[in-house]
UniProtKB/Swiss-Prot annotation:
Its main location: cytoplasm. This is Ribosomal RNA large subunit methyltransferase H. It comes from Akkermansia muciniphila (strain ATCC BAA-835 / DSM 22959 / JCM 33894 / BCRC 81048 / CCUG 64013 / CIP 107961 / Muc). Specifically methylates the pseudouridine at position 1915 (m3Psi1915) in 23S rRNA. GO terms for molecular function: rRNA (pseudouridine-N3-)-methyltransferase activity. It is found in: Cytoplasm. The lineage of its organism: Bacteria, Pseudomonadati, Verrucomicrobiota, Verrucomicrobiia, Verrucomicrobiales. It catalyses: pseudouridine(1915) in 23S rRNA + S-adenosyl-L-methionine = N(3)-methylpseudouridine(1915) in 23S rRNA + S-adenosyl-L-homocysteine + H(+). Belongs to the RNA methyltransferase RlmH family. Keywords: Cytoplasm, Methyltransferase, rRNA processing, S-adenosyl-L-methionine, Transferase.
Length: 145
């Protein structure tokens, strides 16, 4: 199972750059997690690029209007995806204006990380940390305790 994180624009804030690098490095031993950055722009343009880059994947749009999951739910879904041989799961983080309705309608899940609206670079770091936490739980390593 491969996690693909697709995000609009390159992180420019120092904490985001450091957080992205930290969690991508921590995720490496667990297998394939890939971050792909698409060119930033209007919601319409970014949504088209995100949909094209996630073709063939189970899609999860990161959106403030989405469902709130616990870490345990993410772990349970990851187990289910493994059991059903889902090969690629794409998490889509849009531009600052969010996703289009078309993109949301073409996703398997809509996920919110918080009831707060999160700046998209912060959302990227939080998502990577949760994916790392998910992997440690699945592997039985102590990070999550």
């Amino acid at each position: 199972m491969q996690f693909l994180i697709l995000a609009a624009g390159k992180p420019s804030l120092g904490y985001a750059k450091e957080g992205v690098e930290l969690y991508l490095n921590r995720l490496r031993p667990f297998g394939k997690t890939e971050l792909k950055l698409v060119r930033d722009g209007s919601s319409q343009d970014v949504s088209k690029r995100l949909l094209a880059a996630s073709e063939g994947c189970l899609r999860i749009a990161m959106d403030e209007r989405g469902e709130l999951w616990t870490t345990r739910k993410l772990v349970d879904l990851a187990k289910d995806w493994q059991m059903h041989s889902v090969r690629r799961i794409a998490f889509l983080i849009g531009a600052s204006d969010g996703h289009t309705e078309e993109l949301r309608s073409r996703c398997n899940h809509i996920l919110s990380l918080s009831k707060f609206t999160l700046q998209h670079e912060l959302a990227l770091v939080v998502l990577l940390e949760q994916l790392y936490r998910c992997h440690t739980i699945l592997a039985g390593t102590p990070y999550h305790r």
